[in-house]
């Protein structure tokens, strides 16, 4: 049996059990996603919103689409358009908040337009922010890794859309305090070398984890 590139483990942090990941040699973002997905089907891990706190995630109606702003990463944007057999501009006009798009930020409608009876209708091509969502405690280092990867992908989507003429350059006109905070974060991440990894990738398997582990 070969070495597993990414594996999950449980530890305690701040007196509570939490989930973390460790890498065993070279690994890709797809390896991380492959390791992460089984958490959703693991009924032995404490989940805040699950029935009796221990259940699989399938069918749960308290999901990322209802509890978080859904901002797609670049790989997800491309995969969504392909999955839905539409062009990028139509994808944005139909499923994203146009006032945010006009300000240079890609953000799904609220509630998410892809929710059908509380279930994601594009599950195979959902965004990183959705793939990583789980209502259990995550170790700090792992949480920071996931945050960094997700924000990098979201930033890459904004950079790409701007270059393609699909959105305008970022503007703070008429934006909320949250929008302004998000714009500051995106501007900060634009200078990160890891953004290029998303811009040059076709799939999550094309993105190495190492640059995010040692930025």
Q: Which residues does each PLM region occupy?
A:
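Short loop/turn segments that flank or connect secondary-structure elements
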Residues: 1-215
